[in-house]
Amino acid sequence: MMVVKKMIKTIRVMLIPNNKQNTKLFRYANTARFAYNWALGREKENYKNGGKFLSDSDLRKEFTQLKKTEEYSWLNEVSNNVTKQAIKDACHAYKRFFKGCSKFPKFKSRKFSIPSFYQDNVKIQFSDTHVKIEGFAASKKKNKQKINWIRLAEKNRIPTDCNYSNPRIRYDGINWWITVGIEYEDSVTVPSNDGIGIDLGIKDLAICSDGNKYKNINKTKKVKKLEKQKRRLQRSISRSYENNKQGKEYCKTKNVIKKEKLLLILNHRLTNIRHNH
């Protein structure tokens, strides 16, 4: 028996921006981080003074007045929806803390936080090969590549004729990625009464009573080789920090930065292998 249900499926695709687009993406992410930290700071200050919870609508009105000042006029260079959603996210995180669902929200550090920002689900546009980012100005010169359309790494991966939900763009330290939810009809098969036994192990991930075996991805030669390279690189980075230590402070040299970039690439490869298994 088949049952049709409407579901939201998340699709994640890598972006291939040019230099100008890359600069713009970082500007959007930094502005979103600033708006998040500002909203969180206002909530903490208000709570310390004995005030009630500030709603995101009140904070957005206050933020609009802040953008009109000369000191913060640079905030107008970024789409309004980016900062609006960042303030909403800060208020949501603050509410979750008081409901006991999560820890107290922390300020986003420029050094350690993941650069990311929101895109309006109505204004964002997709073609077979590109995505149009809201607020990115188009190039006026015919011989220049359009700035507002960013190339997608996978062709025809995201459908162009459907409703999108919660589009987010984030940077993982190597590449930019766009994540978007799409609604689709899923045919769900009603399970039968037949049972199956599953034996979880170390050599094999799982052995089923019907004879099917599922390999443990961590036992493959490729993953073992990458894990060995990772351990050696981690030890090398640790030695570099110790050798360049100045008193009680660790000094990050250009060589350490290169090694940490290689470590990031190794972790990225291992994550992709396990994700696709």
What are these language model-derived features?
Residues 1-277:
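Nucleic-acid substrate recognition interfaces
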